[in-house]
Regions:
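Substrate-binding cleft of secreted/luminal carbohydrate-active enzymes
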Residues: 138-256
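Polysaccharide-binding and catalytic clefts of secreted carbohydrate-active enzymes
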Residues: 1-151, 158-160
């Protein structure tokens, strides 16, 4: 499957594009329950240099979908292995794109909720960010080695907070997501944070034009750009004027 996707990227890179961005480059959204295949078991055992006698129980009990209070012997090492798998694919994908056209920018989309993004098998932070210092319950000392920010030309962070949690300093506020993102990325890559204006709490039925300028303000002033998920929602709920208002306010602020 990896080779198939890499060939798709090579074919795509032959076109005159400004950039290529990967989405859903992660483990399935069943999170911790995804991919206990024979090949994953084999690759994991090769990685740790040991045989896992009780698989998957020595990693996690079947049905585990959140951080267990009592962790089996290989639980944290399994999380490390998963982020290595995604890290290594990102490196291959970038190399494949650049081998065809070195001028194409290469990036990814990720959810900004880093504190629980280990369930998706992704460490999008800089390898300079020592994850285990801040999240010792689930990150090994080597987890940081598989941060892939330094392999990207840009990254989109989904700051997908609810309509009433735009400003703030922690996760699950748009502003907080972007502020945390800057710390996590350590300057390795420019990033754009932005809201989900069609699916997050309070956004699903439209009618939130008044909130759009604040969402733009919170994200664009705490990151290196702005993006919104998704264009179809802007059109569906006729948010065009609201977006123009938000961007005009930003442009006025940087001209002062």
């Amino acid at each position: 499957m990896q080779n198939f996707v890499l060939q798709l990227l090579a074919d795509l890179a032959k076109y005159d594009l400004d950039g290529i961005i990967l989405d859903r480059c992660r483990y399935d959204d069943y999170g911790l329950e995804s991919d206990f295949s024979d090949i994953s078991k084999q690759k994991f055992e090769e990685y740790i240099g040991e045989t896992v006698a009780n698989f998957p129980a020595d990693i996690m009990a079947p049905g585990t979908d959140e951080l267990p209070s009592e962790q089996p012997a290989y639980f944290k090492k399994w999380l490390e292995f998963r982020v290595k798998v995604i890290h290594d694919f990102i490196v291959k994908a970038r190399d494949k794109v650049k081998s065809v056209n070195n001028n194409i920018k290469f990036g990814v989309y990720v959810g900004a909720w880093y504190s629980t993004y280990y369930t998706s098998g992704v460490n999008w932070a800089s390898p300079k960010y020592n994850t285990s210092t801040y999240y010792p319950k689930w990150a090994t000392a080597d987890y940081k080695n598989y941060g892939y920010a330094d392999h990207l030309d840009y990254i989109f962070l989904g700051a997908y907070a609810s309509v009433n949690n735009i400003y703030g300093s922690g996760e699950w506020t748009m502003e907080g997501f972007c502020k945390n993102g800057r710390e996590l990325l350590q300057g390795d890559v420019p990033f754009a944070g932005g809201p989900d204006i069609g699916n997050s709490t309070g956004w699903t039925d439209g009618g939130q034009s008044a909130k759009i300028p604040d969402a733009i303000d919170a994200c664009i002033n705490n990151s290196d750009g702005f993006f919104a998920f998704d264009l179809c929602h802007i059109k569906m709920y006729d948010y065009w004027n609201a977006f123009k208002t938000g961007f005009d306010k930003y442009l006025e602020s940087i001209e002062e």
